[in-house]
Amino acid sequence: MAKTLAEKVWDAHVVRKGDGEGANAQPDLLYIDLHLVHEVTSPQAFEGLRLAGRPLRRPDLTIATEDHNTPTLDIDKPIADLTSRTQIQTLRNNCKEFGVRLHSLGDAEQGIVHVVGPQLGLTQPGMTVVCGDSHTSTHGAFGALAMGIGTSEVEHVMATQTLSLKPFKTMAINVEGTLRPGVSAKDIILAVIAKIGTGGGQGYVLEYRGSAIRALSMEARMTICNMSIEAGARAGLVAPDQTTYDYMYGRPHAPQGAEWDAAVEYWNTLRTDDDATFDVEVDLDADTLEPFVTWGTNPGQGVSLSSRVPSPEDFGDENAKAAAERALQYMGLEAGTPMKEIRVDTVFLGSCTNSRMEDLRAAADIIRGRTKDPNIRMLVVPGSARVRLEAEAEGLDKVFKDFGAEWRFAGCSMCLGMNPDQLEVGERCASTSNRNFEGRQGKGGRTHLVSPVVAAATAVRGTLSSPSDLDPAPESAAVSSSAA
């Protein structure tokens, strides 16, 4: 029987098949290959094990890092916020008690959990990967079935190394063509979400396919899979190929020698069969895609940067119309305003969506030799300590500092209002993160989701801008279309 990639990975991990079929089917029990843990969703799960007198089933398949609540300045000093300090200390205590490897603040491998896993070679094709975090779908870029789970499910995986789930439907996102300069993976996924809506992927696993996807680097593919959840999907995948293997080869936890050869042979089978069918297929033309930006308060409220803020009257559905009215009020925008005339206060380059080396390089290429708008505050937060060190070895930190940006230590930072990096009430931010909900970056903060190169161009002009809007710099740099 012909199968999609998601079905192949699923079937390879079924420990027990659920009884019944169709709407009456009971959940399957799946084995979990990798469990990633952080300080926010793990305390109750560890406490559940402790109260039940249960051991952690597979400490060797459980990896923890500190990221959500961590400061990105003065990391050698005590954490000021009591709640954040307590959560981080609790994670440290739990990991010590249950024998979990932990990458703490100051550790050479500390960073955002969805950056650390791939860079260490922990994430591999064909795996099942879970984490108590929505954006676990990032790891699907490797052809893994990667899902965010709740705290009760975190405890279940800790206790049994399994997860009870009903099979998902499958959706193909076909992206054909060639991206133009200044257009990136972030623009692809924002366009996809705008097309199918924030609930369009509910109940589905998305597989990203087509020539435009194949042309992307691994870091760009991670950007796309990262935001699958913003379309309502449980997971998003890209079939592994030579690009995947080149990225993984030689990483600390990747197979070596004969084991590598055997792994690649198996990984090459992880692709959707030619005669397999998806429940739904969606097409996107990469040739015509422009830089994309959100105007509202969910990731589906996005338009091309060259267009205008839409009017609620543009929406036929009454719920969408009402949502647009609320969004415009919260964002302090008027319908019909050109997107490129929207002035921002802060630019944030970071998050598990866009904080990897390619993202930093792409942004640095834009700002090199240019001057930051004096009214803009720009935060650059590498996704991991390793990314930070690599960027510094290339001199990127100097590029950002000379531009007037703040160069920070690794962490989730301004992606979410759980650490010191937050917007003030009414502040507007061009952000490379993944969510623009009300208050996401701080109470009353206003967020526009953008790509790294749009973020950089915005920092130069002070208004939402693309690289093509900039005058030539003294030191010009080409913008790679594969940059995330």
Curated annotation (Swiss-Prot):
It comes from the Bacteria. Its EC number is 4.2.1.33. It catalyses: (2R,3S)-3-isopropylmalate = (2S)-2-isopropylmalate. Keywords: 4Fe-4S, Amino-acid biosynthesis, Branched-chain amino acid biosynthesis, Iron, Iron-sulfur, Leucine biosynthesis, Lyase, Metal-binding. Signal peptide: none annotated. One of its GO terms (molecular function) is 4 iron, 4 sulfur cluster binding. [4Fe-4S] cluster binds at residues 352, 412, 415. InterPro entries: 3-IsopropMal_deHydase_lsu (IPR004430), Acnase/IPM_dHydase_lsu_aba_1/3 (IPR015931), Acoase/IPM_deHydtase_lsu_aba (IPR001030), Aconitase_4Fe-4S_BS (IPR018136), Aconitase_4Fe-4S_dom (IPR036008), IPM_dehydratase_rel_enz (IPR050067), IPMI_cat (IPR033941). PANTHER family: 3-ISOPROPYLMALATE DEHYDRATASE, HOMOACONITASE, MITOCHONDRIAL-RELATED. HAMAP family: LeuC_type1. Belongs to the aconitase/IPM isomerase family. LeuC type 1 subfamily. This is 3-isopropylmalate dehydratase large subunit. It comes from Arthrobacter sp. (strain FB24). The lineage of its organism: Bacteria, Bacillati, Actinomycetota, Actinomycetes, Micrococcales.
